[in-house]
Amino acid sequence: ASDVYKRQGRDMLANVDALGRPTPTARFMGGRDHELLTKGCVGSASLSDIAAVISKGIFIMPGRVPGVGPFPQARGGWRGAPPVGMAEKLASATLYLALMTQTCLALAGMGQRIILEGPLARNEPFARCLSALTGVAVHVSADATGTATGAALLLLKADHDPRLGPAVQPVDLPGLSAYAQNWRAYAQQAR
């Protein structure tokens, strides 16, 4: 068995894929986190807002929803200056969700591409940040029924999904790599 299943205390489990194989899974309450972090905000962050959050060192720490995710003991909160206004709140939340998603994918054993579906598939800055943080191609699904479509593709033995467009362009934001390293160090301390 892979050592991925031995990572205790990180909210991981084994699911089963459509072919009956064990699939490592890491999870967190991303939708709930987003709701709590962006309450009263409308829209999505711009890349310039994300760059401002990086340069100001505004961090959202894991643990908004206690007891779950890769840092279940963390207590959440802000590190550094709190965000000023809706734009910085949205940008901070976008970075946080991308970092948490990257962490979960790394724990579970990331593949060679990421396919986004659901509400975050409509958030281009999130997709572009995730691509930059993981170094993996990120595709956005235009299909609202990804699970059913995936099952059909397996049944038909199709090797690709025609509803996937080209991979998003990873962001190239000054300081993103250092920001991510700092966030990971802070998150590990909170574990």
Q: Residue spans of the language-model regions?
A:
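Active-site core segments that coordinate phosphate-bearing ligands/cofactors
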Residues: 2-115, 122-191
